[in-house]
Structures are given as C-alpha cells and as structure tokens.
C-alpha cells in the first residue's frame, strides 16, 4: 500500500520519516524531496531494491544510479581515495546541487548498475532528505520519473509517473532549484563537467583554480 505524507505538517513529517525508514529497510522504494528535483530512492546496499528502482523508471543498467549521503564524512568509506579538487568542491558546494563522480572503494558490496568502478555522490540541501539519509545511511537515488519523461519538481508529478511502484511519498512542496544537479567527473586526469546545472561552471572553475573552458575538455 502506498502512503503519502505532507512534510509541511510536523506530525506528518515525523510519521513519514519513520514510514520511509521502514520501507527502505524492507527493500522498498521511497520518493523524497531534494533541493534539485524529487528523487526515487532505495538502500544503496540492497541490490534487489536498486534493481526495482531501475525497473520502476524503465531504465537499464547502462545508466547507473547515483548515491546521496547525509554528511560529508560518509563519503570517506565510499571512495577509493579523495581525488584532487574533491575536498575543495565539497567544502564549497555541499550540501547542494553538485554531484561528483569518483572511483568507488573496491570493497563496497553494492550494485548500482554498470558504473565501471565509479560512483556519483551528492549531499542534498534539503532538511527532509538529510533527516532520512542520516537515519538510513547512503541511498541509491535517481530522479523520480519514468525514463525519458521530465523529472518531477513536486510529489504529485512523481506519483503520477511512478504510482504504486513506490511505498512512501514524502511531499515537501515544490523543489527549490527545479533542475538536475551539476555533475563533475573527478575520475580522470583533470575534472570534467558532464552536465551543467545550478552550480555554474564558472563557480566550479574558481574553486578549482582552473579555466572554465578546461572543464569541458
């Protein structure tokens, strides 16, 4: 049975977080608000739940799922090593609308899709998302839409696409940014912007001390 909670109401928010935590621990899917767009999430270490997430979206393994974290320190156990520039970008833009692609720790027992030893990480700037992430740990999260359809910027848009595939919808009103996060790849010799977004290339270049044009090389 699908449940929806209005997180503008403190009591519903509290009950919603409890319900979402239970759903995630049971291997089910949850729709959650973030600062960019609404996301559909699962326990990052539950491969069956991640497979269900991809199925709900109609998405193949060739488009692996990113991971949201609830604190800066969480990523220390998820990456092989902190690449050059990662700490600077995290200090400048986390929590916020910047996703970083890094080489994952080889010991991790998860299956996020065909990620070829990499993982995309982000710490969202949203109190409901952070509260949930701090309760359950890292979550595999993708935009809460059917593949090829517009990413939802509110819970109703997400529910209209995903319906009963999701156990719990946490409704916190419209997303602030209403656009997907900026994605920066830190797995190569130099940083590259894979997807422009709310965090501008110019701001990223300034933090890294490089020319903005080099980020598209």
UniProtKB/Swiss-Prot annotation:
A molecular-function term among this protein's GO annotations:
ATP binding
One GO cellular component from the entry?
A: cytoplasm
Question: What name does UniProt use for this protein?
Answer: Putative threonylcarbamoyl-AMP synthase
Q: Which UniProt keywords apply?
A: ATP-binding, Cytoplasm, Nucleotide-binding, Nucleotidyltransferase, Transferase, tRNA processing
Cross-referenced NCBIfam families, in alphabetical order?
Answer: L-threonylcarbamoyladenylate synthase
* Species of origin: Mycobacterium tuberculosis (strain ATCC 25618 / H37Rv)
Give a short account of what the protein does. Answer: Required for the formation of a threonylcarbamoyl group on adenosine at position 37 (t(6)A37) in tRNAs that read codons beginning with adenine. Catalyzes the conversion of L-threonine, HCO(3)(-)/CO(2) and ATP to give threonylcarbamoyl-AMP (TC-AMP) as the acyladenylate intermediate, with the release of diphosphate.
**PROSITE patterns to which the protein is assigned, alphabetical:** YRDC
- All disulfide bonds of the chain are none
Q: Does the keyword Nucleotide-binding apply?
A: yes
Q: Does the keyword Cytoplasm apply?
A: yes
> Which positions fall inside the YrdC-like domain?
14-199
Tell me the Pfam families matching this sequence.
Answer: Sua5_yciO_yrdC (PF01300)
Which Enzyme Commission numbers does its entry carry? 2.7.7.87
- Look up the record and give one Gene Ontology term from the biological process aspect: regulation of translational fidelity
Concerning InterPro entries, the annotation shows: DHBP_synth_RibB-like_a/b_dom, Sua5-like_dom, TC-AMP_synthase_SUA5
- Where is this chain's protein located in or outside the cell? Cytoplasm
